[in-house]
């Protein structure tokens, strides 16, 4: 049973909408996870880490990766260790700080990420295939309003 099925008609529309959004997110994420595993023998966290590094050609410190991915340093270290072993990322010393290093994509890692990112984009476009261009624009605008309200001073004070 998905999350949305837990809501009843007497629940507020906002709660039912929230559960529908969560359900849609989970369904799409499951499709992406399965696709990454089946087509590229990788995981979504590994894809996410490589995505962060693709945006930073000079690499990133581990603590910055952890912050951007919103996961613990231990998680980033474990994923990084796997990717280093596979030759997809490399660790580079940070000048002036013997305790730190930067992580960056290797040439092989960058090529692998580009292949994965192209397919990822295709999966996301496919997931929204039931909507026409106008509906996508409208949904994007409405979710933008939700996002803006969620960042309002009142929401942050709670």
At which residue positions do the language-model features occur?
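N-terminal leader segment of winged-helix/HTH proteins
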Residues: 1-40, 158
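C-terminal regulatory/oligomerization modules of transcriptional regulators
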Residues: 1-11, 133-158
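Charged, amphipathic alpha-helical coiled-coil/dimerization segments
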Residues: 2-6, 81-141
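Short amphipathic alpha-helical segments with heptad-repeat character
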Residues: 18, 22, 26, 70, ...
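N-terminal helix-turn-helix DNA-binding core of bacterial DNA-binding proteins
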Residues: 26, 30-72, 86, 154-158
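Alpha-helical linker/hinge and terminal dimerization helices associated
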Residues: 28, 32-35, 69, 112, ...
């Amino acid at each position: 049973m998905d999350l949305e099925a837990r809501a009843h008609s007497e629940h507020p529309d906002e709660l039912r909408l929230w559960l529908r959004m969560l359900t849609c997110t989970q369904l799409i994420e499951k499709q992406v996870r399965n696709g990454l595993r089946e087509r590229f023998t990788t995981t979504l966290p590994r894809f996410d880490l490589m995505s962060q590094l693709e945006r930073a050609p000079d690499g990133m410190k581990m603590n910055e990766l952890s912050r951007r991915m919103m996961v613990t340093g231990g998680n980033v270290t474990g994923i990084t260790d796997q990717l280093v072993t596979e030759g997809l990322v490399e660790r580079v010393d940070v000048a002036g700080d013997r305790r730190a290093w930067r992580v960056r994509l290797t040439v092989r890692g960058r090529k692998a990420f580009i292949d994965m990112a192209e397919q990822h984009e295709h999966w996301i476009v496919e997931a929204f295939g039931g909507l026409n261009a106008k509906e996508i624009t409208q949904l994007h605008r409405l979710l933008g309003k939700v996002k803006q309200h969620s960042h309002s001073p009142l929401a942050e004070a709670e």
